[in-house]
Every structure is written in structure tokens, then in C-alpha cells.
Amino acid sequence: MDRVVFFFLIAATLLAGSLGSTVISGEVTDGFVNPIRQVVPEENDEQLLNAEHHFTLFKSKYEKTYATQVEHDHRFRVFKANLRRARRNQLLDPSAVHGVTQFSDLTPKEFRRKFLGLKRRGFRLPTDTQTAPILPTSDLPTEFDWREQGAVTPVKNQGMCGSCWSFSAIGALEGAHFLATKELVSLSEQQLVDCDHECDPAQANSCDSGCSGGLMNNAFEYALKAGGLMKEEDYPYTGRDHTACKFDKSKIVASVSNFSVVSSDEDQIAANLVQHGPLAIAINAMWMQTYIGGVSCPYVCSKSQDHGVLLVGFGSSGYAPIRLKEKPYWIIKNSWGAMWGEHGYYKICRGPHNMCGMDTMVSTVAAVHTSPK
């Protein structure tokens, strides 16, 4: 069935390209017109005016300015290309909503370089990595959300720094610390950016390196060796690296007791999420540049991960693509600010196919209570 639907969508994409004169009114999201249904591959004067209008709205909403007219014109061309890309993404991911985001003036290459930072190349688990025990799954709830339990801090923003790995690791440790102490504390990502240079000795180019990328398990290993993490307010995030480490052991508020890798079985992922708190995971972010909301369940998605995020929950019936029965989904906290996605969150379908590689690199961490001296 999925293959039939996929080929139907490919045909629809080609047909849409041939019906360039068809214009459907846009959708409105938080007062901002989503023009994805007004964009066609070939521009006429009216469509060009629409693109210029939406580019003006885009610049206003996201406070975008460009140093020169040449740069402005280049970004407008990129913006138009991303409108067409969002329209194609909508056809191939119909249960989500795709359109204009804060990244709509970036090429895919620029987007990956500036906002994705997972060091995934050649990834394999170290031989001494602890594996999470198999948990019972017969009594799993159909829906669960750690936000409702008070275990998740507000959405943060990594800025133009490839430090997603640090936000993923910190989010998991914030949740683990909450489970251990019943206290929700915002911890310091900047401590990891500045101070964590942990490496997997079995792999070249596997060291955590601030805005140039890292791995969540390396970050947990660093936290174990360093003794713990400081509060965000004591070591605030700047989104810059190559600065001196300002770690103060006297201000540690959360420490790692252990961490482990979770099985790629989705029931085991759900069981570990419910029992051990939010999980640090990796995902392929190719569909996230144009994502606005809904449940993303694309018919094609690479399983090569390039982005670290935080798994905080799951739902039972979030979408019904092509009139099929409603399907379950995962709830993911991202680190691109609350203006992206569903107030900073991403929903992606659950199932046996390792959607966008999200089942491959999943870690759980446990915390111990540490009082400031």
C-alpha cells in the first residue's frame, strides 16, 4: 500500500508541475501566511509578486536583514527555491504541514552546516558501551508525554552553532535529574560546548568539538568524568565555541550516574522513555527545514542521522495519511527556538521502519542528586 501511495504522490508532483496555472489560497499559521500552495515550478508575473510579498513577510517575521543588495537578491532566489521545495515536501509528506520557516533563505547545504551538528560519519558504538536491559512492554500506555509531568525545560535555541548534540544530551540529563530529585533545573549546554572534548578512541574525528559537532554519548562520558553540570544561569549559552572553559566544580547541580544505549525496537524505546525519562536520540533532519506542524511521515527519508534531539513522548492517533487509519507518533523536542515547528516540537510517525533513522542512536541517562556547595 505504501508503495502504491508513494508512486501516486510522485505522479501528483509531476502533474502539479504541469498545471502551473493552478493556484490554491495559502494557509495561515500563527498569523503568517503559508504560501506553499501558491508556488509552482514556473513563475509568471503574478506568482513572482506573490513570492516577493511572502519574502517581505518572512523578513519582517524573522527580522532578517542583508548587508548588500546582491546578498538580498541571492537570498530571494534561495527563498523561491525553498518555496518550491516546501511544496514538493508537502506532496511527499502529506500528514505534516510544510512551508516557510526561519530557514527559508538558506540552501540545504547552509542549513546542514549551520544548524546540524551530529558527528555521525562512520558511527559505531564503542565496545564498552552499556546496553539498556530489556524492559517489559505489555503495559505500555497508548500516550505519554514528559512535558505533562514537569520533566522538560522550555524550548531552547542553539542559534547558528552545530551544538544540537549538547542540547540533546542536556535535555536527557535535565529529565533524569528531575526523576532523581523532583526538581527541574535548566542545565548548561555551553559547558559542553566549551569544555567537552571527549573522544571515542576507536574512531577518527569522533571528538566533541563545540559548534562543529559532537555525540550525546561522548557528552555523557564527559559529564561522568567532570563530576557533573552547572546551571544554565551560572554558565549561560552564547552559541560560540573556541572560548575558555569556565567550569566551576563548586557549582555542580546535576551529575550522571550511568548511561546506556537503548535497543532499536520501538517498544523498547517507548518503555525506556516511560521508565527512565526523556531520551537523547539522533535523526535525519532533511524534512525539518520546511516543517511547520503536524505529524511528519515522509514516504522517503534517509536513515543517516545528522541532528541530535530529545524524545519526550508519544501519541496514539495523530494523523491519517491518504485516508488510512490514524497512526501513532513520537514527540520530539528540538533546539531551534519556539518559533519553529509546533512551538519548538516535532512529531514523527512511529512504526517498524526506523523512520528517518530515529531508532538507531537512542540513549538513556541516569542522574544522582548533587547539592551546590
Swiss-Prot record:
Which GO-annotated molecular functions does the record name? cysteine-type peptidase activity
- Propeptide residues, chain positions: 21-139
Gene Ontology BP annotations: proteolysis
Q: Record's GO cellular component, any one?
A: vacuole
Q: Which cysteines are joined by disulfide bonds?
A: 161-211, 195-245, 301-356
Q: What induces it?
A: By drought stress.
InterPro entries, per the entry: Papain-like_cys_pep_sf, Pept_asp_AS, Pept_cys_AS, Peptidase_C1A, Peptidase_C1A_C, Peptidase_C1A_papain-like, Prot_inhib_I29
Record's keyword terms, sorted: Disulfide bond, Glycoprotein, Hydrolase, Protease, Signal, Thiol protease, Vacuole, Zymogen
Q: Which SMART domains does the annotation name? A: Inhibitor_I29, Pept_C1
Q: Which PROSITE patterns match?
A: THIOL_PROTEASE_ASN (PS00640), THIOL_PROTEASE_CYS (PS00139)
Instruction: Give the Enzyme Commission number.
Output: 3.4.22.-
Kindly indicate whether the keyword Protease belongs to this entry.
yes
Q: Cite the active-site annotation.
A: 164, 307, 334
Q: Where is this protein localized, as stated in its record?
A: Lytic vacuole
Entry keyword Nucleotide-binding: no
Signal sequence interval, chain numbering: 1-20
Question: Which EC class is this protein assigned?
Answer: hydrolase
Give the glycosylated residues. 258
Instruction: Tell me where on the tree of life, at the top rank, the source sits.
Output: Eukaryota
The record's listing under Gene3D superfamilies reads: Cysteine proteinases (3.90.70.10)
Stated family: Belongs to the peptidase C1 family.
**Biological function:** Probable thiol protease.
Question: What name goes with this protein?
Answer: Probable cysteine protease RD19C
Which lineage?
Eukaryota, Viridiplantae, Streptophyta, Embryophyta, Tracheophyta
